A protein has these predicted regions:
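Sec-dependent signal peptide hydrophobic core
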Residues: 5-14
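C-terminal motif of bacterial Sec signal peptides marking the signal peptidase cleavage site
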Residues: 18-21
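Phosphate-/polyanion-interacting regions in eukaryotic proteins
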Residues: 137-138, 157, 164-166, 182-185, ...
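Well-ordered beta-sheet/strand-loop patches within structured domains
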Residues: 2-5, 23-73, 149, 169, ...
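Cationic-aromatic interfacial patches
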Residues: 23-175
């Protein structure tokens, strides 16, 4: 053999030896699954009853489910093999790092602790003793299991415990446990996690737009959230002081403000936020202060959470009212057929969430005033002015339907209600306008025109007693009739004749009712963030529902068990 050939053999042998050595060293530098399993069991066994924690002050959100999972697995690690993290383990860490793109909050899954622990276990780490310690591998395995169980539950049902919002809701961890078992059968962890997400267009559209929002967002600075509506002035003052310090509008030693100082501070904030400078605090000021990227992201989280809990499938044709947007839309086969501004209930006379079907249209309707309005508005006004009913054009009727003379009633004898119906006759001055859309519901709510059409020019349109006023009522009734399949008549032309009839009734100011055969499904819902025209639209939390969910989410993501 020549020297060149021998040299080649030597080099190949050296490479083989090096590879074998590296593999051997790699195993020795990590640890074996048997040792990790022993440490997992020890970590749990060493805890006092009830076993809701493990060592080193790490935090768990699903302690009971996590412990049960390891008992079922005989304490074998679920994310680690002899050579280190499994592919699924690495995928899960990456998922948690990017969990915002799924509308989830990183802090809910021990991201900081997992990252710190993971860095100690890297082969290029300076923490050689830490890397060789099986207890550290046990810790990260437990943290990953806890995170997985939390993520699957949150992707499936949201952050909020169902029984906190719904009395008849039930919760079962069985499917999350089954998903955990399935991670040992496939390397496609992402598919397992995404299988828990809603498939609805509303959810998926919002999710698709999240990366663009996140790429432009700045989460580097945390700002104090200002509660609204203001229910406690002292709390509000404390919050606005703290918030102002964060923007260097107040010295750090300020702890309280008198009324003049508060007004001057508000003026500073109004100037900075390009608001009208009047020194008065209210809705616009607080909206501007809470308009941070962190709060916008949390609003997205809240609404994706709603979509996870409210998994609805919609028909090909339906009417949609999103209350915070102050808009109505009619969708047909994914296309928007009608869009209209709406006026919704005031915060103290809210429009309820409703699922129903529009089954009647009435021209020049009368208005039978709800008992709640009679108690709160009508009766007090009658007591102040005997001529109130006549001035408003209201009539009253007894239980038998007989008209009653208001002057014959001793109004002072009634405190909370009256044994009469109060009815406003149809006409241009009627509060319902000249068109009403009926749909069965227990709240006596309907869509209608209005005699105060100028209010549609307002940007904030939470102004009604609870019903939904529709600006484009004329387009809506024509769409409903033209798309209706009349009984025993397949000729669409006959629907056109009916539209003409309705126009005739309107011109003649006649009260008529049209029954709809092909009833139009209607959904009245509440979403403060939604996709529209390829971007995320944010809407004001008109009824304070976001605040309720925000508080529940913050409470639910605070871990309930400590690794101590």
């Amino acid at each position: 053999m020549n020297n060149k050939f021998l040299s080649k053999i030597f080099i190949v042998s050296l490479l083989i030896s090096s590879i074998i050595s590296c593999k051997s060293n790699n195993k020795s530098e990590t640890t074996s699954t048997k040792l990790v399993a022993t440490e997992i069991k020890t970590l749990f066994d060493n805890q006092k009853e009830p076993k809701t924690s493990i060592e080193d002050s790490s935090l768990l959100t699903t302690p009971n489910e996590t412990i049960a999972a390891y008992k079922d697995a005989n304490y074998e690690p679920l994310w680690i093999k002899d050579e280190g993290l499994t592919n699924n383990g690495q995928t899960l860490i990456n998922f948690i790092r990017n969990v915002r793109s799924y509308g989830l909050i990183p802090e809910a899954y021990n991201l900081q602790k997992i990252t710190s622990q993971y860095n100690k276990l890297q082969l290029d780490s300076l923490w050689e003793n830490e890397r060789k310690n099986p207890k550290n591998w046990a810790r990260i395995d437990i943290l990953l299991t806890d995170a997985f169980l939390s993520i699957t539950r949150n992707l499936d049902r949201g952050y909020i415990p169902l029984d906190s919002l719904s009395k008849d809701a039930t919760y079962s961890a069985a499917k999350y446990k089954e998903a955990l078992i399935n991670t040992g059968k496939t390397d496609n962890l992402l598919q397992i996690l995404e299988s828990f997400e809603p498939k609805s267009k509303s959810y998926q559209d919002l999710k698709k737009l999240l990366p663009n929002f996140l790429s432009a967002a700045d989460f580097s600075k945390k700002y104090t959230f200002i509660d609204y509506p203001i229910t406690n002035k002292n709390k509000f003052v404390a919050q606005i002081i703290k918030r102002s310090k964060e923007e260097n509008l107040l010295p750090n030693d300020v702890t309280n403000l008198d009324s003049i100082e508060l007004s001057n501070l508000v003026k500073k904030i109004q100037e900075k936020k390009n608001l009208e400078i009047d020194g008065k605090y209210g809705r616009q000021l607080i909206l501007a202060l809470n308009n941070t990227d962190s709060e916008k992201f949390l609003k997205i989280v809240i609404n994706m959470d709603r979509l996870r809990r409210n998994r609805e499938e919609y028909p090909n044709r339906y009417l949609w009212v999103n209350l915070p947007s102050f808009y109505l839309q009619v969708f047909e086969n994914g296309e928007t057929k009608i869009e209209s501004k709406v006026i919704i209930g005031k915060p103290n006379t809210r429009t309820p969430l409703i699922t129903s079907k529009i089954n009647q249209i009435t021209t020049y309707p009368t208005w039978t005033i709800p008992t709640s309005i009679i108690s709160k508005e009508i009766l007090p006004n009658i007591k102040k002015n005997n001529n109130y009913l006549n001035r408003k054009g209201y009539s009253i009727f007894d239980a038998s339907g007989q008209k009653v003379n208001p002057d014959s009633v001793n109004w002072s004898s009634y405190e909370k209600g009256i044994p009469f119906k109060v009815v406003q006759p149809g006409g241009d001055a009627n509060s319902l306008g000249i068109m009403k859309f009926n749909f069965p519901n227990k709240y006596s709510v309907y869509l209608h025109d209005t005699n105060q059409r100028s209010l549609f020019n307002n940007s904030f349109r939470s102004l009604s007693h609870g019903c939904v006023r529709v600006q484009n009522w004329d387009s809506l009734y024509q769409y409903i009739i033209l798309s209706d399949k009349r009984a025993n008549d397949d000729d669409i032309a006959s629907n056109g004749v009916l539209v003409d009839s309705v126009k005739t009734w309107l011109n003649a100011k006649k009260r008529r009712t049209v029954s709809i055969v092909n009833e139009l499904p209607i959904y009245i819902r509440y979403y403060t963030a939604a996709s529209k025209n390829g971007k995320i639209e944010f809407y004001e939390d008109v009824y304070g529902e976001d605040n309720k969910i925000r508080n529940l989410i913050m409470k639910s993501i605070n871990p309930i068990a400590t690794l101590n």
